[in-house]
From Swiss-Prot:
Source organism of the structure: Klebsiella pneumoniae subsp. pneumoniae (strain ATCC 700721 / MGH 78578)
UniProt xrefs under InterPro entries: Cell_div_ZapB, SNARE
Principal location: cytoplasm
Family: Belongs to the ZapB family.
Segments forming a coiled coil: 5-81
The protein's name: Cell division protein ZapB
GO terms under biological process: division septum assembly; FtsZ-dependent cytokinesis; vesicle-mediated transport
Region called Disordered, residue ranges: 43-64
Role this protein plays: Non-essential, abundant cell division factor that is required for proper Z-ring formation. It is recruited early to the divisome by direct interaction with FtsZ, stimulating Z-ring assembly and thereby promoting cell division earlier in the cell cycle. Its recruitment to the Z-ring requires functional FtsA or ZipA.
NCBIfam families the record matches: PRK15422.1
Subcellular location(s) of the protein: Cytoplasm
Stretches with biased composition (Basic and acidic residues): 48-59
Encoding gene, per UniProt annotation: zapB
């Protein structure tokens, strides 16, 4: 009878350890989910910022091209004079 009680107590202890481990892992999973959501938002924000910078870069290149064309036209007129 004593042997059965010892085995039961050991089993109970192992079950409790398993429950504690599962609880800790569930908490860790929740923390990781929150971190993942934060990182997803940061990535989306960075992508949005990159898209804006690419648009701005494109506009600046167009403006530069326009100024270069005007400058070439002015230099052409100066050579004619």
């Amino acid at each position: 009878m004593t042997m059965s009680l010892e085995v039961f107590e050991k089993l109970e202890s192992k079950v409790q350890q398993a429950i504690d481990t599962i609880t800790l892992l569930q908490m860790e999973i929740e923390e990781l989910k929150e971190k993942n959501n934060t990182l997803v938002q940061e990535v989306q924000s960075a992508q949005h910022g990159r898209e804006e910078l690419e648009r701005e870069n494109s506009q600046l290149k167009e403006q530069q091209q326009g100024w270069q064309e005007r400058l070439q036209a002015l230099l052409g007129r100066m050579e004619e004079v």
